[in-house]
């Protein structure tokens, strides 16, 4: 069974900017984010990125620039023996009215199709409401981080009609969110061991 985690990029893995991340030099990883992805890999998770990149549609940078940023990310991960299972991006602006710009579910649809699995319960970690909303149609488990736009988003959560978002756990950064996920895994493993012990007692 494939274990997936879906991450937003800007504001979760790397620093964000109101002026967009346009060059490889502007792409700067947030403290702990590379190690957090590596820890997910070591725990058996495939990590996928779903990111809006409207700077392409706005003419602020091109696909070569985007590829250079992602090569930098991949290189940093490789140094820790880690990798991404895929990067799914939307290059469109809001005026394009596309199906893939979050909060529309197109990127999440594409991930489900690519991996051929249900995304029900798959953690989706983001810093904005649109990140978390994008996963609702697939019943992803939303997790908010306070980096990037996250602090402002946290203030908005209580007014959201989607009860799933109101109940989303909030962490300071990706590193802490991964701590939470891995701790949950340990708890599940303990429960499985208890069930096995009960079955042995029945025998």
Residue ranges and their predicted role:
Residues 102-132:
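Conserved Lys-Pro-Asp/Glu-containing loop-to-beta segment of HAD-superfamily phosphomonoesterases
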Residues 33, 37-70, 83-96, 135:
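Substrate-recognition element of Asp-dependent hydrolases with the DxDx(T/V) motif
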Residues 1-48:
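Active-site neighborhood of HAD-like aspartate-dependent phosphohydrolases
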Residues 125-169:
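Acidic, Mg2+-coordinating phosphoryl-transfer loop and its flanking beta/alpha structural elements
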């Amino acid at each position: 069974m494939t274990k997936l985690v879906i991450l937003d990029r800007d504001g979760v893995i790397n620093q964000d900017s109101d002026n967009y991340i346009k060059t490889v030099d502007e792409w700067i990883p947030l403290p702990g984010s590379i190690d957090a992805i590596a820890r997910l890999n070591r725990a058996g998770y495939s990590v996928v990125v779903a990111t809006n990149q409207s700077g392409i549609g706005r003419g602020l940078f091109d696909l070569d620039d985007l590829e250079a940023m992602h090569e930098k990310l991949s290189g940093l991960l490789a140094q820790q023996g880690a990798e991404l299972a895929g990067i799914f991006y939307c290059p469109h602006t809001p005026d394009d009215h596309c199906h893939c710009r979050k909060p529309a579910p197109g990127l999440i649809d594409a991930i489900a199709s690519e991996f051929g699995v249900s995304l029900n319960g798959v953690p989706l970690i983001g810093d904005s409401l649109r990140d978390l909303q994008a996963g609702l149609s697939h019943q992803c488990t939303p997790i908010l981080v306070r980096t990037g736009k996250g602090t402002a988003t946290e203030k908005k959560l209580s007014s959201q009609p989607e009860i799933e978002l109101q109940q989303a756990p909030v962490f300071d950064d990706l590193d802490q969110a991964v701590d939470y996920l891995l701790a949950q895994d340990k708890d599940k493993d303990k429960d499985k061991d208890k069930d096995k012990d009960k079955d042995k007692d029945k025998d």
